Amino acid sequence: MEFDHEIHPTAIIHPNAKLAENIKIGAYSIIGKFVELGEGTEIGNHVSITGHTKIGKSNKIFHSSSIGEQPQDMKYKDQETCLEIGDRNTIREFCTINTGTVEGNKKTLIGNDNWIMAYVHIAHDCIVKNNIVIANNATLAGHVEIDNYVVLGGFTAIHQFCKIGEHAITMGGTLLSQDVLPYVRAVSRGGMAFPNGINSEGLRRRGFTSEAIN
């Protein structure tokens, strides 16, 4: 079946890659053999998408991002692992998102409606759910789990295996080596993260009443 695509002539698309309808791919981007792109997804210039990577509908991936490369894990021995990205995500410039490992169900997962800003790194086996904002230069180590409606401030760094509860927020430059409870605002002091009250402003923006917040 022939689909109507906008693919720059300098882009390199492996013949086995699976492209749905209305795909846009910019100059010098590379789409690998085992990649699947959902309907309406737009790929910018100089983007590399490789590995066993499945990307859903209406995503926008900006230039120079690297999606689906092998995990940065010294235990990794070229096993077949994957990355799955849902629908309507925005992935800005120079982001890196790796596939999973056999120690982590072989899969890295990104949900729907997430806003991932420039220079973000999402490591192997992470689970990033839905409606999440990850600001510039944030780093998620392996096996990190981010629940729905979380906001991660710029330069937030999260240690492996940490979990961030829904509706939580981290201030810019927060260094996390432990889990963060839902609804909490986390800040760094002296190189360590501490809870600093409730994410009241974020909860109000999402329709929580004052009674519910209090």
What is each stretch, according to the model?
Residues 1-6, 12, 18, 42-130, ...:
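Glycine-rich hexapeptide-repeat left-handed beta-helix
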Residues 22:
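A glycine-/small-residue-rich N-terminal strand-loop-strand element
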Residues 26:
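Basic, Lys/Arg-rich alpha-helical nucleic-acid-recognition elements, primarily the DNA-binding modules
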